[in-house]
Structures are given as C-alpha cells and as structure tokens.
Curated annotation (Swiss-Prot):
Catalytic activity: octanoyl-[ACP] + L-lysyl-[protein] = N(6)-octanoyl-L-lysyl-[protein] + holo-[ACP] + H(+)
InterPro entries: aa-tRNA-synth_II/BPL/LPL, BPL_LPL_catalytic, Octanoyltransferase, Octanoyltransferase_CS
GO molecular function, one term: lipoyl(octanoyl) transferase activity
GO cellular component: cytoplasm
Domain BPL/LPL catalytic, first and last residues per copy: 57-241
Task of the protein: Catalyzes the transfer of endogenously produced octanoic acid from octanoyl-acyl-carrier-protein onto the lipoyl domains of lipoate-dependent enzymes. Lipoyl-ACP can also act as a substrate although octanoyl-ACP is likely to be the physiological substrate.
Enzyme Commission code(s) on record: 2.3.1.181
Source organism (scientific name): Bradyrhizobium diazoefficiens (strain JCM 10833 / BCRC 13528 / IAM 13628 / NBRC 14792 / USDA 110)
Superkingdom of origin: Bacteria
Region (Disordered): 1-23
Metabolic or biological pathway, per its Swiss-Prot or TrEMBL entry: Protein modification; protein lipoylation via endogenous pathway; protein N(6)-(lipoyl)lysine from octanoyl-[acyl-carrier-protein]: step 1/2
Name of the molecule in the record: Octanoyltransferase
Family, per entry: Belongs to the LipB family.
Localization of this protein: Cytoplasm
Length: 249
C-alpha cells in the first residue's frame, strides 16, 4: 500500500486525526483531467518529473485524473504467483501494494502533495485517501468501509451471502522527499472480468471480490465522479485550481 519513510504509529486508520492535511497559504492544488487514456510509462515519467519539481519548490502540488488502457501494475509487495492470466501488459511500479488492474471506466487519481509542508505522517495520509474515497462514494449513496487487514475501500454484499464484500477502490502510495505520488483508483464502470487475470491486491478469499459504482446500480458518469471527488478533496486538503492542459509535468 505504501512505499515510504518509516512511520511507527500503530493506531487504527479510522481513528487517526485527518484534520491537519489542509495546507495554509501557498498555491491551490492544480487539478488536471486527461480525457484520452494515458499509457502507464508516460504517466509514471510525468509523475516523477512533477514530484521532483514540487520537492524543489519549482511547481505547485497536483492532482491528475486519468484513465489507463487495460494493464496490470505490481507494487513493491507484488507476487508473480498472483498474475494468473497475463492478458494485458504488466508493469512493475515503486508504489506500495500488490497487483491491481487499471483500464477504461476506472478513475485513477494521481495525487502529488508536499507532506512535509502539510503533515509528514504516512499512515494518516493513507487514511485521508481512504476518507477521500469514502466521501466520494457517499455522494452516490454508496457506503464504503475501511478494513484494517485489507487495503482499499470495500462495500458489503449481503446479496452474495454472509461476510461477502467487494472492493470498489484501491490505494497505492509512494513518497519521495515527502512528496506523495501514485494515489487512488475508483471503479466507476470498468470491465470487472479483467480483474480475473490477477489476485487483486493479494486477496484470494472467494468472499472478497471486486465491484464498481455501476455494478452496484449507480448510473453515474466519470464526470459525475470527478465533481464529487474534487469536492471531497477540497474538504480534506484545501482549494484546487482547474487546468486545461493534459501533461502532468
């Protein structure tokens, strides 16, 4: 989930204080949306460049919303044995976590924030990303929940049986010089069968599957989700400024 400086705190994430991530002063966070799918290597190169610029004080913070063409990514805890059917390109990545799928219909938000200026607390930052997802889902009357033993945000599925839950959003974070990158992925309307090519995030228990907003009966568009995501982000992290250009660097 996180590849970062060491942080010894062991509080449950739901109990962590999330109130101090809104920076005072400074520029609003740039908010950028790419309409066309962005190849993964291109996105990583752009993030790396932007993170270096933020750390050097040469660029403002950035949230970059995009979709990828179908692909799998493997985090620092990824296992080759969890790649069951490599039907799409697979990329090793420096973020925390294991294997996941990205593709059209999934809103990826790459979040590049200066945590040294805001609050250098890794676990609380991850909890704040969970809260960002929870608030976004709540805008569509979907109750997401944290799980201390499983990464991401989950929804209960009593229609499938007792104890069944589906993952609706993933989190994977990396830090360089206390600047965050990578981020979150919310399933809006992806092709859920593509997750069958992997063991998503290493969770093999058949009670735990994958879902999306549309799969749950919420007829929402990507634009709807973007509006809710931005509102939730500003509640947690402060003001944003929309940009038209698509390049993240």
């Amino acid at each position: 989930m996180v590849n970062s400086p060491q942080n010894p705190r062991q509080d449950q994430r739901q109990d962590l204080d999330l109130t101090s991530f809104s920076a005072t002063g400074g520029e609003p966070v740039e908010w950028r949306i790419s309409d066309a799918p962005v190849p993964y290597p291109e996105a990583v190169a752009a993030m790396e460049a932007r993170v270096a610029a933020i750390a050097a004080g040469e660029a403002p913070e950035l949230v970059w919303l995009l979709e990828h063409p179908p692909l799998y990514t493997s985090g620092t805890s990824g296992k080759d044995s969890d790649l069951l059917d490599p039907r799409f390109p697979t990329f090793a990545t420096g973020r925390g976590g294991q294997l996941t799928y990205h593709g059209p219909g999934q809103r990826v938000a790459y979040i590049m924030l200066d945590l040294k200026r805001r609050r250098p607390d890794v676990r609380a930052y991850v909890a704040s990303l969970e809260e960002l997802i929870l608030k976004t889902l709540a805008a569509f009357n979907v109750r997401g929940e944290r799980r201390e033993d499983r990464v991401g945000v989950w929804v209960k599925r009593p229609d499938k049986g007792d104890g069944y839950e589906d993952k609706i959003a993933a989190i994977g974070v990396r830090l360089k010089r206390w600047v965050s990158f990578h981020g979150i992925a919310i399933n809006v309307e992806p092709e859920l069968s593509h997750f069958a090519g992997i063991v998503p995030c290493g969770v093999a228990d058949p009670r735990y599957g994958v879902t999306s907003l549309v799969d749950l009966g919420q007829l929402v568009t990507m634009a709807d989700v973007d509006v809710a995501l931005r509102q939730a982000f500003e509640e947690l992290f402060g003001p944003t400024r929309a940009l038209v250009p698509e390049a993240a660097a």
